[in-house]
């Protein structure tokens, strides 16, 4: 039996799976929709597809390091409970190991582990997403994980303890750049415009406002850069001062936090659930 667009549409509506997945299932069953559904249920594809619409904003950051290269991987799920599940952590660890071994892109990792991901979704009943991967290279690397939620890798020069402490600082203080001079010109220009407007709205003449802004801009670039921030373990000193004292330096760093940029779905209140039930 020929696999028609109508059959593919029917299978998609009944399983919630993707078009190509449905077409493949129908080709394998010679157009038999019922058998295709049965096969997809057995493989977990139908169940996984239904879970795919669920927001996966929990999860964990995984770090692996070898021969001067470190990989940070974010894998998401829907609940903190599953983020600690052995099946989930084993899957993510396998993905991270492959990323480190092959320097694979996120798209390559997603494609390579799609079948295993689908099977795991079917097994644990939550949507799972291989979301982000980043690499850091350097002669001296230090990593730090704060629980499962935040992962940091720092590359630089210096003793292991100092670089580890810097990684902990990055986890806590969220710097965006290494040095104040690394802040992009467009970011500086945009912030300057805002600060000039604020100063002028305070009733200051433009020439005075401009001078005030210079001080504010220095503060701004310091706040968003690692070396300009007060060191979390010795707040009276900047990170730059700590690095100088210890004969260390930072070349680059990467900080990943679970769920950054993912919009979590708001749960319904009890009253909203009752109202919705009455409408139904």
UniProtKB/Swiss-Prot annotation:
Entries under Pfam families matching the protein: EF_TS (PF00889)
InterPro entries to which the protein is assigned, alphabetical: EF-Ts_dimer_sf, Transl_elong_EFTs/EF1B, Transl_elong_EFTs/EF1B_dimer, Transl_elong_Ts_CS, UBA-like_sf
Keyword presence, Translocase: no
Keywords: Cytoplasm, Elongation factor, Protein biosynthesis
Subcellular location: Cytoplasm
Statement: the UniProt record of this protein carries the keyword Glycosyltransferase: no
GO CC aspect terms: cytoplasm
Example of a GO MF term: translation elongation factor activity
Secretion signal, residue range per the UniProt entry: none
Residue ranges of coiled coil: none
Chain segments carrying region Involved in Mg(2+) ion dislocation from EF-Tu: 79-82
Function per UniProt: Associates with the EF-Tu.GDP complex and induces the exchange of GDP to GTP. It remains bound to the aminoacyl-tRNA.EF-Tu.GTP complex up to the GTP hydrolysis stage on the ribosome.
Family membership noted in the UniProt record: Belongs to the EF-Ts family.
Protein name per its UniProtKB record: Elongation factor Ts
Organism: Vibrio vulnificus (strain YJ016)
């Amino acid at each position: 039996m020929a696999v028609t667009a109508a059959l593919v549409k029917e299978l998609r509506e009944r399983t919630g799976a993707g078009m190509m997945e449905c077409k493949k299932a129908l080709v394998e069953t010679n157009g038999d929709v019922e058998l295709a559904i049965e096969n997809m249920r057995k493989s977990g594809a139908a169940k996984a597809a239904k879970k795919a619409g669920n927001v996966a904003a929990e999860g964990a950051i995984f770090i692996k390091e070898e021969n001067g290269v470190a990989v940070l991987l974010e894998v998401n799920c829907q609940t903190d409970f599953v983020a600690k599940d052995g099946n989930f952590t084993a899957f993510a660890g396998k993905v991270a190991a492959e990323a480190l071994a092959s320097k694979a892109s996120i798209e390559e990792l997603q494609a390579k582990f799609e079948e295993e991901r689908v099977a795991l979704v079917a097994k644990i009943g939550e949507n799972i997403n291989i979301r982000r991967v980043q690499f850091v290279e350097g002669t001296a690397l230090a990593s730090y994980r704060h629980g499962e939620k935040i992962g940091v890798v720092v590359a630089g020069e210096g003793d292991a303890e100092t670089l580890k402490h810097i990684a902990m600082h990055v986890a806590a203080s969220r710097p965006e750049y290494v040095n104040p001079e690394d802040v992009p010109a467009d970011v500086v220009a945009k912030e300057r415009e805002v600060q000039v407007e604020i100063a002028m709205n305070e009733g200051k003449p433009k020439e005075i406002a401009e001078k005030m802004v210079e001080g504010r801009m220095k503060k701004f670039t310091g706040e968003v850069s690692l070396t300009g921030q007060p060191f979390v373990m010795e707040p009276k000193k900047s990170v730059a001062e700590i690095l100088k004292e210890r004969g260390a330096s930072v070349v680059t760093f990467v900080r990943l936090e679970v769920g950054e940029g993912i919009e979590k779905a708001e749960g319904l209140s009890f009253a909203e659930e009752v109202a919705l039930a009455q409408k139904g």
